């Protein structure tokens, strides 16, 4: 079956959990979380869960695993904590949970960021994607620009297709 055929069979509505990782954001100040919600809704997807967690490995893993265990979640989207400071532990937390890494997500995110957005600063991004069982997790930087780029260029065009692939096994 071709990619085109897979995309035709893919679900039109994907159920998502948004996790914002920040020591300072609140629901009112979480612009990237709000942007994720808007972009998903505009694309016809459903946000079934949303939370803000602190920049610590255990809290991040608990939030991701809570999404994994929920029946009404197909995808967990995290934003924040992907940089190189001491407090940035999202990648370590998420990668320890993954069954399979979607290596192309991070590679393409950095390439597009380099070419279209932030130039050589793209090398500092540690965005990651992967699967846990039949669910997918994408972890992206916390800036609104990075969220918009990741969603519009990479995640939204493939969200239904990825969900289809994980459920046809």
Swiss-Prot record:
Keywords: Molybdenum cofactor biosynthesis
The UniProt record lists the keyword Ribosomal protein: no
Cleaved signal peptide residues: none
Descriptive protein name: Molybdenum cofactor biosynthesis protein B
Annotated source species: Bacillus cereus (strain ATCC 14579 / DSM 31 / CCUG 7414 / JCM 2152 / NBRC 15305 / NCIMB 9373 / NCTC 2599 / NRRL B-3711)
Family from the record: Belongs to the MoaB/Mog family.
Record PANTHER family: MOLYBDENUM COFACTOR BIOSYNTHESIS PROTEIN B
Gene3D superfamilies in alphabetical order: MoaB/Mog-like domain
